[in-house]
Swiss-Prot record:
Localization: Cell membrane
Residues carrying lipid (S-diacylglycerol cysteine): C17
Family of the protein in this entry: Belongs to the UPF0257 family.
Name of the protein described by the UniProt record: UPF0257 lipoprotein YnfC
């Protein structure tokens, strides 16, 4: 058998041998919203998605769903945190996100569709020259956000009158596996927790299935919590 034909057959048999799509950076809106609303950022022409966090007992702990325009703006965003019995549902309307049920104006926007202010809580967001949210300032606290060269969120620091909480994430060196990461949480100079995540990816280098381990080091002995994350993503 000729070598080129053999390689062709091997490519047909082996998973991942088809041509991968070129990597796209994370948009300012996707990266910033993922920071504020606590979900894994996605890249590429995402049309709609859902992320479901499940405990090791198979119970849904949290779910995030969203729809995006072809320009990358969030048309809708819905979050349900079952562990803490909280949630919200937002729908885009010109320069605001409204509550999907009451239609009350909730979030004020800037630029194309970036976060600007949450008037009811007295929170304002500031962006850098590239449009990424780099800080959120409220009445009694300030949050500073950090990103890498591809726009991936790599940490945040929350400062209030009592302490300083920092989270620092280190993603995989493999550019196609950004959501494989380790993170460390500190209160002032004391480490209080760590997180490890590993995922399987689609052709856009977005996570499909992930395993998440959260270790609470603020108690002795430390307590580990194991989760799985199921992602459904549709593209344009």
């Amino acid at each position: 058998m000729k070598k080129p034909l053999l390689l062709t057959l091997l490519c047909m048999i082996l998973a991942g041998c088809d041509n991968p799509k070129s990597l796209e950076s994370f948009t300012p809106e996707m990266a910033s919203f993922s920071n504020e609303f606590d979900f894994d950022p996605l890249r590429g022409p995402v049309k709609d998605f859902s992320q479901t966090l499940m405990s090791e007992n198979g119970e849904v702990a949290k779910q995030v769903t969203g729809t995006l325009s072809q320009e990358g703006c969030f048309d809708t965003l819905e979050l349900h945190d079952l562990e803490n019995n909280t949630g919200l549902a937002l729908v885009l309307d010109a320069n605001y996100y409204r509550d999907a049920q009451t239609l009350e104006k909730k979030v004020q926007l800037q630029g194309k569709c970036q976060l600007a202010a949450l008037p009811s809580a007295g929170v304002t967001w500031e962006t850098d020259d590239n449009g990424f949210v780099v800080s959120a300032t409220g009445k009694e606290m300030k949050v500073e956000y950090r990103y890498d060269s591809e726009g991936y969120p790599v940490g945040k620091t929350t400062i209030n009158s009592q302490n300083r909480l920092s989270v620092t994430a280190k993603p995989s060196a493999n550019p196609r596996k950004k959501l494989d990461y380790t993170a460390v949480s500190r209160v002032d100079d004391r480490q209080v927790g760590n997180v490890t995540q590993s995922c399987e990816y689609d052709a856009y280098a977005n996570p499909v299935d992930c395993r998440l381990v959260i270790v609470d080091e603020s108690v002795k002995p430390a307590v580990s919590h194991h989760y799985t994350i199921k992602n459904r993503i549709d593209y344009y």
